């Protein structure tokens, strides 16, 4: 049975990832820095030091890399690459700075863009981190870096991934990317995207 590493899972589990991973064919192993959410592995980015090399078919990381400092991003991506099997791939999601930039250019940083399960999210929350959570002491949710589609793909390739495929969701204000450990054709990358970049 293929396994995926759910990095920075928080309270979410496989039925809140992507359609393919929610199926019974995939086994989920959860990882989080916060032991209170009861992950399978208590560990953190950028190191993933408690995860064996070449031990996973896929890595799923939703809205984690923006919480790293810029110099930690290459280390985190290399760690994801390290834990993947030879034909493995990583799925990454994060806020879309291009959409955010358009709102900032209009001078509006306070009007909510959308409402999350934790409450309204404004441009300033996307830029610096969700303020209500940080006010409650969860400083892990502070944002220290950000990406456009181009910069996310470049970061993955520079970290050693062979290919990158992704898309923007302007109405959802986020980016979705898939990076493979071994080289694939453009058609193969598109097919992988159709299968695995299907949010629930």
Identify the function of each model-found stretch:
Residues 1-10, 116-124:
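Conserved long hydrophobic alpha-helices within structured protein cores
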Residues 3-102, 179-181:
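Conserved SAM-binding loop
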Residues 72-79, 83-85, 89-200:
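S-adenosyl-L-methionine-dependent methyltransferase catalytic module, highlighting the catalytic core
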